[in-house]
Curated annotation (Swiss-Prot):
It catalyses: 4-CDP-2-C-methyl-D-erythritol + ATP = 4-CDP-2-C-methyl-D-erythritol 2-phosphate + ADP + H(+). Keywords: ATP-binding, Isoprene biosynthesis, Kinase, Nucleotide-binding, Transferase. Belongs to the GHMP kinase family. IspE subfamily. Its EC number is 2.7.1.148. ATP binds at residues 97-107. Pfam families: GHMP_kinases_C (PF08544), GHMP_kinases_N (PF00288). It comes from the Bacteria. The keyword Chloroplast does not apply. The keyword Kinase applies. One of its GO terms (biological process) is terpenoid biosynthetic process. HAMAP family: IspE. This is 4-diphosphocytidyl-2-C-methyl-D-erythritol kinase. GO terms for molecular function: 4-(cytidine 5'-diphospho)-2-C-methyl-D-erythritol kinase activity; ATP binding.
Length: 291
């Protein structure tokens, strides 16, 4: 069979409400409206007998040891659940920053599962595919079919596709990797403790851009404040985006350090990206659309 290819887009938390810390397992219970960007890693699979991975691209260096890569971890989980699973050699081209709050590794893992599902004629809702996604990481299930939807719990509750209008946006990462654990530690919730705050607004399917902004503007990312104590440069990135013409909303994604801003139109987003690149030439800056 010939080479298979798919994209692994950045996952953006348009909202991220932390409801509390669950008494049973200690995980943080979340509600998040998730969208996906046009900017992405690329994953290829050359079918063959042995499982292998090669990583290249501008952010390949920080991606860590190959044996621990989520692409291989996801493939191994699926192979454990499907007898005789056909495998092969993966080639991952890394464009997305690592430890950045945009689910790059999770999206890569989900891309691997999509390619293996295609190779083995498995549906994405096949129990073994879902189980492999959950076993690989909390954000992997929502990345299997990368379209806007609600995510709840510790990532295991995935809502239906919302078919939201594309949002012109700019993604900015100030080049500081941020691990999730220190951010949740800074949030400081004890097991069983709930976090005060307004409930997440309801999100209807098929909203246009103005309606999406109307939903997410009064919402929040509850990890933004603790992340600022871990990496204060996040605040600089947010301020720089908010100063750009046409910026309608700027917020951190995930546990950081990537931030995003939604703009009035594509031209404004392109202009803002150019201005941020001039102001901070060492930062990762990408104009894109979120949907």
């Amino acid at each position: 069979m010939s080479l298979l290819t798919t994209r692994a887009p950045a996952k953006i938390n348009l909202t991220l409400h932390v409801l509390g810390r669950r008494p049973g397992d200690g995980y943080h219970a979340l509600e998040s409206l998730v969208a996906f960007a046009e900017v992405a890693d690329t994953l290829e699979l050359l079918p063959g007998r042995d499982l292998a991975l090669e990583v290249s691209g501008p952010t390949a260096g920080p991606a860590g040891p190959l044996d621990d890569n989520l692409v291989l971890r996801a493939a191994r989980h699926l192979a454990a659940g499907v007898d005789g699973l056909r495998l092969g050699a993966f080639r991952l081209h890394k464009q997305l920053p690592v430890a950045a709050g945009i689910g790059g590794g999770s999206s890569d893992a989900a891309a691997a599962l999509r390619l293996l599902a295609e190779l083995n004629a498995l549906a994405l809702d096949h129990p073994a595919v879902i189980a492999a996604a959950r076993a690989t990481g909390a954000d992997v299930p929502v990345c299997l079919d990368p379209r806007a939807r609600m995510m709840r719990g510790a990532g295991e509750e995935i809502g239906p596709v919302l078919e939201l209008a594309p949002l012109p946006a700019v993604l900015v990462n100030p080049g500081v990797p941020v691990s999730t654990a220190p951010v949740f530690k800074a949030l400081g919730l004890a097991v069983g403790q709930r976090l005060d705050g307004a409930e997440h607004p309801g999100v209807a399917a098929g909203l246009d851009a103005d309606a999406v902004l109307g939903v997410i503007a009064p919402a929040r990312n509850d990890l933004e404040a603790p992340a600022l104590t871990v990496a204060p440069v996040i605040g600089e990135a947010l301020a720089l985006l908010r100063a750009q013409g046409g910026c309608r909303l700027a917020r951190m994604s995930g546990s950081g350090a990537t931030v995003f801003a939604i703009f009035s139109d594509t031209a404004a987003a392109q202009a803002a990206a150019g201005a941020v690149r001039v102001a901070q030439p060492g930062w990762w800056v990408e104009p894109t659309r979120l949907a």
